[in-house]
Structures are given as C-alpha cells and as structure tokens.
Amino acid sequence: LQSSYNALMGQINPHFFFNSLNGLNSLIRAGEQEKTLEYLEGLSNVFRYILQSNHKTLVSLDEELQFVKAYTYLLGVRYEHKLFFSIQVEETYMRKKLPILSLLPLIENAVKHNVISKRHPLQIQIYTKSDNWLVILNSIRPKMEETVGHGIGLKNLRER
C-alpha cells in the first residue's frame, strides 16, 4: 500500500509545487494580501488532501470535487483570464465513491497538452449525466510542439 501511495505521489506533477510557490511569490510581490491569503488556504487544502490520501483508496465525489476546486483555484491564479472551470454535478451523485485523486490526472493532462492563452482560453467542465456518468470535458487546442510524457497518470487511473 505504501509503495502504491509513493508511486501516486511521484506521478503528481512535481512542477505544480514550484509553480504554486511562484504564484504565491507573485501575489506577495504585487501586494495582493487578500488574494495571497485565499491562495495559501487553497494550497494548504490541496496538500492536506494529498497527504491524507495515503489512508484512503476511495472517497466520495463530494470530497474529490472539494479537492478539485482548491486545485483549480490555484491553476486559475496562475492562468488568470485564460483558464475556466465549470462544475455542475447533481447532489444525488455526491455520495458516489471513486478512487482518490482520480480527477487530478485528467485536469493535469488538459492543462499540459492544450494551448492556454487569452485568445484561446482553456475551458474544463465537470458534470454528471443522467445515466450515472461523470464527464470531464475540455476544449481541445493541442500545442504545436509535442509535450513529452509517459502517460503514467492515465495508466495509474485505469489500474485503480
């Protein structure tokens, strides 16, 4: 179990940590005190969830979406006015169980493999369909250069 957890943690984009600290640094330098405090709270929630994830294999959709909201808030600060998230999940689905951190690789891949600019903002939607489907949909604007990756995040998600 511990080795599986360590493998999962290694798959979370290591640049996320550094980008988060750079985002925090930018907010501090800009004197954005209120935004800095919100950002710190979001960062704290993200890391708390990740650290506590070694004790769970399944979580409710509600728990996973709370994590996603904190994570996407951090991304939103980094990609201000270029990245938009929409979550529309019916209350009846919130108790459904899914593997912990299962939405993260889908969001990371959308960000990693698409152009994100003011002219072409990335839109990611998470919603439910009446036939028990959870849908993660994003606008597709592939980057011109191929992003090198090994597909480990999606492979891990399929295995879980």
Predicted stretch roles:
Residues 1-159:
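Two-component histidine phosphotransfer core
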